[in-house]
Amino acid sequence: MALGNEINITNKLKRQEIFADIKHEKNKERHTMRRKRAKEERENPELREQRLKENVTQTIENTRVYDETINKEVEGDEDDLMRYFNSNSNEPPKIFLTTNVNAKKSAYEFANILIEILPNVTFVKRKFGYKLKEISDICIKRNFTDIVIINEDKKKVTGLTFIHLPEGPTFYFKLSSFVEVKKIVGHGRPTSHIPELILNNFQTRLGQTVGRLFQSILPQNPDIEGRQVITLHNQRDYIFFRRHRYVFKDNERVGLQELGPQFTLKLKRLQRGIKEETEWEHKPEMDKEKKKFYL
């Protein structure tokens, strides 16, 4: 039964009956087609393989539009952070951790979490009268490699600022979806072992720079016997932080125990040097193109 002038039928019951018949006929045709296709594929398995190969669901990820400013010829070029890895220095990173001015309790609680996650951290409460440039100069003289600033607003941690010393760059991330350790069901207790680092899906030149940032604040010699791993998974320019421990159940099976916490980072700004020239900044109009990602 074809769909013609049935929509103009004024009798509601009659109209519903006709639409039900049309729907039933379409379902009948679909089931007949599926039975016929299944019979053909049983006789020739190659037809099924070809159908599954061609039947690829379109997602935002596989229809991604790459940033036209990324040139493949320069995608592997060095950035400011690459010099850190080329310096052949075996010294572990030394991190100076602080907060914004007049921070509240939530910022200090999050600082305790970062002290547990990042090795070789020195935390200092932020005082009035010290500008960021002055703090950076003091940290450089004391051989700190990075500054991490916890940004808090209205008693809530809203972002993280990373400054690589001595010449930058500076990263500002918005922080969201924070879940405390105690709210994670079945969480474990972390140990003092240096964790492994897994970076996933950082594909563009900007994404590689962000990945090198996280590589530079964690030592390159993890304690394998600790079985702890930090995962930073980039999906649609949102960076998901997770921390787990491998749990060996027997000689063949292995599981994961989450250690926590959970939070999400989104890059908002990348600046050269110590908060100098803006190299990249996220703008609201960038969110209009849902298939275009920058990391």
Swiss-Prot record:
Residues 93-276 form the Brix domain. Keywords: Nucleus, Ribosome biogenesis, RNA-binding, rRNA processing, rRNA-binding. SUPFAM superfamilies: Class II aaRS ABD-related. Residues 24-47 are annotated as: Disordered. It is found in: Nucleus, Nucleolus. GO terms for molecular function: rRNA primary transcript binding. One of its GO terms (cellular component) is nucleolus. Residues 38-47 have a biased composition (Basic and acidic residues). One of its GO terms (biological process) is maturation of LSU-rRNA. Present with 784 molecules/cell in log phase SD medium. Part of a complex that includes BRX1, RPF1, RPF2 and SSF1 or SSF2. This is Ribosome production factor 1. It comes from Saccharomyces cerevisiae (strain ATCC 204508 / S288c).
